[in-house]
């Protein structure tokens, strides 16, 4: 890690500590899950959630009647310096260890895009990162206090934090793209009863970017399967293409953020 990246993370941690004072000291490193993709981890954690969720981890705001974010009202605003500031606070329930993971996730956006997550002062619209009962977020800016949930027992990983924050910037799951049927096959008979609605296509702005099998926002092959190991999503024409990952934002994920916000 170079000096600038290290400094960035230290500054982020300082901001997090100002948002809510640290109450305990723990080791700074947390490992990502080694055997499952991010979506599988999220869905497993969210099984016990009392929140009404769409596509596994998306909250439908009360001021919208569908998962639609078509106009600029649900995007975060760019300032005079062409920087998109997203005010946020972090719950005091998170440990210093948790906050370092969140800071790491935020630093990826700062290093690769014009998005800047800034500690909230008096801004009316802001993200509140909280230890709720699951991993979830709304799509885009909803107005006022906007909860991004990262449950301490299953969601505090850099990749999951990036995934949920990317939802908050306005991005859907990759397999929800309007043109997805050209790239994946949905195996409807393998989907758990009552879960098919999670595979509906959305009216998306694909920004003239290619379908990204490697997107951080893509379901894994067995999402919502009726039994373990059954594929609910199969890449086409090459069924062996890997989908679902845990590392973090892909190059195309980053490209789309920059295109959407005119970075």
Swiss-Prot record:
Classification via Pfam families: Astacin (PF01400)
UniProt remark on cofactor binding: Binds 1 zinc ion per subunit.
SMART domains: ZnMc
Record flagged with keyword Signal: yes
Signal peptide annotation: 1-19
EC category: hydrolase
Catalytic activity: Hydrolysis of the inner layer of fish egg envelope. Also hydrolysis of casein and small molecule substrates such as succinyl-Leu-Leu-Val-Tyr-|-7-(4-methyl)coumarylamide
Gene3D superfamilies: Collagenase (Catalytic Domain)
EC number in record: 3.4.24.67
GO cellular component, one term: extracellular region
Source species, domain of life: Eukaryota
Record localization: Secreted
Location of the active site: 164
Domain Peptidase M12A: 65-263
Name recorded for this polypeptide: Hatching enzyme 1.2
Organism listed in the record: Danio rerio (Zebrafish)
Upper classification of the organism: Eukaryota, Metazoa, Chordata, Craniata, Vertebrata
């Amino acid at each position: 890690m170079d000096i600038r990246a290290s400094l960035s993370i230290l500054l982020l941690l300082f901001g997090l500590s100002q948002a809510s004072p640290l109450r305990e000291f723990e080791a700074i490193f947390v490992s990502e899950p080694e055997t499952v993709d991010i979506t599988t981890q999220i869905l497993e954690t969210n099984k016990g959630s009392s929140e009404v969720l769409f596509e596994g981890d998306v909250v439908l705001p009360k001021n919208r009647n569908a998962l639609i974010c078509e106009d600029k009202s649900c995007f975060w605003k760019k300032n005079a310096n062409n920087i998109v500031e997203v005010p946020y606070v972090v719950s005091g329930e998170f440990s210093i260890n948790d906050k370092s993971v969140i800071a790491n996730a935020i630093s990826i956006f700062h290093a690769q895009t014009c998005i800047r997550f800034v500690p909230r002062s008096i801004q009316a619209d802001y993200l509140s990162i909280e230890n709720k009962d699951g991993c979830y977020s709304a799509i885009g800016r909803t107005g006022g206090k906007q909860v991004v949930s990262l449950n301490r027992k299953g969601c505090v990983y850099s990749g999951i934090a990036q995934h949920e924050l990317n939802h908050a910037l306005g991005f859907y799951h990759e397999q929800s793209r309007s043109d997805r049927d050209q790239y994946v096959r949905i195996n409807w008979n393998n989907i758990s009863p009552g879960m098919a609605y999670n595979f509906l296509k959305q009216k998306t702005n694909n920004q003239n970017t290619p379908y990204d099998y490697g997107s951080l926002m893509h379901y894994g092959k067995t999402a919502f399967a009726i039994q373990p190991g059954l594929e609910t999503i199969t890449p086409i024409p090459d069924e062996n293409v890997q989908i679902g990952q845990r590392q973090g934002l892909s190059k195309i994920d980053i490209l789309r953020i920059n295109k959407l916000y005119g970075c």
